[in-house]
Amino acid sequence: MRRGSAEMRAEMNRIFWAADSTVQTNDYTTYPQTGIGQVFPLFVKPEYQVCNHAKNGRSTKSFMDEGRLKAIEERIGAGDFLFIQFGHNDEKKEDPTRYTEPFSTYMENLETFIRVAKDHSAYPVLITPLERRCFMDEKHLGIGAHSDYVAAMKQTAEKNNVPLVDLYSMSRMELKKAGEKNSRRWYMFFPEGEYKNHPEKSEDNTHLRYDGAVNFASLIARGLKEIGGIYAEMLLDLSLIHISEP
């Protein structure tokens, strides 16, 4: 049943999140992998509920084709938010079930997500994809992994008058500041034997551990604060938040 009345909205504000594995909620079977949407509740007021629909490996195309956007459409209501964060899998040319062309089908798909939110009097927010850990040496990042998709998302935001959080640019700055070695702690990059349920070595430069998820979630929170208005109202006082791994 779709919730839309003012009375029900006063009880709980909902943030729906359509995205991929960088945002997905994980469990003990995939620990220490942690998604941004999994930890984002740490940054929002208790009257806001994060409804995380992010799923590993999905692009805008496969997310819709599998009925995942439809599932959001059946629940989202007036005053809710829809965070839209894709790019990692849209760029996979070798997979026709996921690939989208940045300045045509990708933009068209983003506009479909936006329409779903607006048709239900909800608030869409576009979030550029998280940068991969793509160092050339200790201090220098390589060419951005998602540059065309970032540019396409920015064009879509401007065309449709939708707020945008540029996580891509902010995460690149964070990676440059941290450097190659120090940034490993944010990603699934660790030696053999560090985790009991993941005993093998991992050099995954895309997926996150807890510290990384929290760090990049905080960047999204910062972006929402800069947008202001209802987007900032959902946030706790960021200056008072101190989070350590559970």
Q: What residue ranges belong to the model's regions?
A:
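Acidic/histidine-rich helix-loop elements
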Residues: 26-32, 54-63, 93-101
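Short, solvent-exposed polar/charged micro-motifs at secondary-structure junctions
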Residues: 60-64, 175-178, 244
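Gly/Ser/Thr-rich beta-alpha loop segments that engage phosphate groups in nucleotides
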Residues: 21, 59, 89
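Solvent-exposed, flexible loop/coil residues
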Residues: 27, 40, 67, 212, ...
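Residue-level preference for alpha-helix termini and adjacent loops
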Residues: 22, 62, 205-207
